[in-house]
Amino acid sequence: MKMNEKVILHDMSLRDGMHAKQHQISINQMISAATAMDEAGIPLIEVTHGDGLGGASLNYGFPAHSDEEYLSAVIPKMKQAKVSALLLPGIGTVDHLNMAKDLGVSTIRVATHCTEADISQQHIDHASKLGLDTVGFLMMAHMASVDKIVEQAKLMVSYGANCVYCTDSAGYMLPDEVSLKISALRDTLPSSIDIGFHGHHNLALGVANSVAAIQSGARRIDGSVAGLGAGAGNTPLEVLVAVMNRMEIQSGIDLYKIMDIAEDIIVPMMDQPIRVDRDSLTLGYAGVYSSFLLFAKRAEAKYGISARDVLVELGKRGTVGGQEDMIEDLALSMSKLCK
C-alpha cells in the first residue's frame, strides 16, 4: 500500500485479551477500556469471548458475562469506533451472527485454520448478505505455504469476504515470511479486497512483523493496548502507533492517549504481566497456538509436567486452534511416562 494511506488499527485487548484474563473481564472494565479507546481514535474494537461468539463452554472457558451482555454494554457507548466480533465455524453459529448484527456489530471476522477456508462459506456468505464488513481470518498462517494461503484467501473472497487476514496465531513468523505472504495476497487479490495481519509477540516481533505487513500492502493491522492477549500478547498497539508516527504512517490514533490507556486502564487489569517468558517464548519457537499457554500452565500445576515440554510436544504434533482438549490428555500421558 501507499505509505500516505491510513492504516486501520484494530484493538484485540477485549477479545484476545480474554485468554490472558481467563475470560473474566467485567462489564465495567470492558466499558472503561472501550470508551477510552474510542476517545483515543481507535477505529475498530473487538468484543467477544476469547474464542469468539458462542465460545462459552467447558472446553474453552466460561466468561464472566455472555457475548450479548458485553456487546450490549459497549456498542451504545461508542462515538466513533466500530465494534467487531470474531466467529469460528463449529463454535459460533448463524444465530450468533444474527444476534451480533442486531446489537450493532459492524464487522464479523470468520476464522478458520489456514487450510480450512471451505468451512467458512456459510458464515461468510451470511455475514456478507447481512451487509456486514466481512473478514476472512486465516489462522496459524505459518503452517501453510504462500500458494496455499493465496488459494484459501481466494476461497474466502469467493464466499463474500471483503478483507482477508494472514494470522500469525503462534507468534512464529519472521518479518521476511510476513512480507512474502502479505505481498502475495496483495498481488493476487482484487484491489477492492483489504489485506490484514494479526501478530503475536511470542518472539518479540509483533511490531516488526506488523510494519513488514504494512510495507507489503496490508491495510488492517491487529494489536492490543499494552499487548493484552494470548501468549506473550498481541502486537502492543501503543508501541506500533509510536513506530508508525516515526515512519509517518497515518493511523488517526492519539499516541499519548493510547499510552495512558495502556498504563492506567489495561495494565491494572492484568492478572499477571504480559511478557515474553520461557513458556510464551516456547509458543513462538515451536509454532504453537498462543491461547494454549494458560492451558499448559494449568496442566503443569496439575500433573507436574513442564509447560514448556507440553508446548514443544504440541508443536511437534501440529496441533491447531480448537484442540485445547488435547492439552490435558497429553500432560496426563507425559506424567505417566515419567513415573
UniProtKB/Swiss-Prot annotation:
GO terms for molecular function: 2-isopropylmalate synthase activity; 4-hydroxy-2-oxovalerate aldolase activity; manganese ion binding. The record marks 15 as: Transition state stabilizer. GO terms for biological process: catabolic process; L-leucine biosynthetic process. Disulfide bonds: none annotated. Keywords: Aromatic hydrocarbons catabolism, Lyase, Manganese, Metal-binding. Mn(2+) binds at residues 16, 198, 200. It comes from the Bacteria. The active site is at residue 19. Pfam families: DmpG_comm, HMGL-like. SUPFAM superfamilies: Aldolase, post-HMGL domain-like. Substrate binds at residues 15-16, 169, 198, 289. Its EC number is 4.1.3.39. InterPro entries: 2-IPM_HCS-like, 4OH_2_O-val_aldolase, Aldolase_TIM, DmpG_comm, DRE_TIM_HOA, PYR_CT. The keyword Cell cycle does not apply. It catalyses: (S)-4-hydroxy-2-oxopentanoate = acetaldehyde + pyruvate. The keyword DNA repair does not apply. Residues 7-259 form the Pyruvate carboxyltransferase domain. PROSITE patterns: PYR_CT. Belongs to the 4-hydroxy-2-oxovalerate aldolase family. This is 4-hydroxy-2-oxovalerate aldolase.
